[in-house]
Amino acid sequence: MNHYDLVVIGAGLGGCSLLASLEKLGYQGPVALVEAGRGPGGRTASRRSRTDPKWCINHGAPAIKLSESLPSAVDGLLEPLRDAGTLQRVENHEVTIDANGHVVAVYPASPSPGEWWTGRPVMASVCEGLLGQSSNKLESHFSTRVRWLNRTPEHWMLSDQSEDWQLKAKRLVLSGNLLAHPRSLAMLQWNDVPLRSAVPKGDDPELDAVLTTLEASASTVRWNLMLDLGDVAFETPALPWQIWLT
């Protein structure tokens, strides 16, 4: 069984940024990244075809909005991505369409300050670039969904549904809340919340407070529609990068 100093569950922007930050800070211990998807991305994932290596479409957030003034640590993570062309400013405009199909004022009426940035060639390239800043001490376990968590005084034990795959970790980071939020009960038809089962109520008052707060957060199902228009010659001006439906 593999044993790590640190295991990060979730290869979205949060998990990948953490790993890149630890690299810059000189973290030396063996680290593992565990992700249910076939690659990094999380909420900024890009869906790749299983049969056509050239086919890929963004089906998560199409861009991220960055304020004009970023903390130096964040800027230090993003600068290599900008320099490599992996993170690029969005130049196309946004439009809003009403129920009658008419273009109306841009939504929201008072946008937050900052600029939109997107990944190239696809949005998941941002997370891939962040992981590229990590050393070869990082081991990635993709297409692996953690189902069971167990906690002892010495380590965490992680297992998949069948328990054929297992890891041990001195430290554990959940970069998403699926293993800590009741939404997993309905979404994955589990009968328990893994983190709550691993640390029974009363064992850790601080964790109890966190899980109570997290439990109060709402979760609703969302569906994404992915369209492949093929090789279409669009006329100028360029298509809007985002269309808001009101």
Walk through the language-model features, giving the residues of each.
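Short beta-strand to alpha-helix junction loop
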Residues: 63-71, 103-132, 141
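Core beta-strand elements of the Rossmann-like FAD/NAD(P) dinucleotide-binding domain
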Residues: 2-4, 162-171
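Glycine-rich FAD pyrophosphate-binding loop
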Residues: 7, 21-51
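N-terminal glycine-rich dinucleotide-binding loop that anchors FAD/FMN and/or NAD(P) in oxidoreductases
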Residues: 48-73
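Central helical "cap/lid" subdomain
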Residues: 53, 166-244
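Beta1/beta-strand and adjacent pyrophosphate-binding region of the FAD-binding site
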Residues: 1-14, 32
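A conserved short coil-to-beta-strand element within the FAD-binding core of flavoproteins
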Residues: 141-157
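Conserved Rossmann-like nucleotide-cofactor binding loop
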Residues: 14, 39, 179
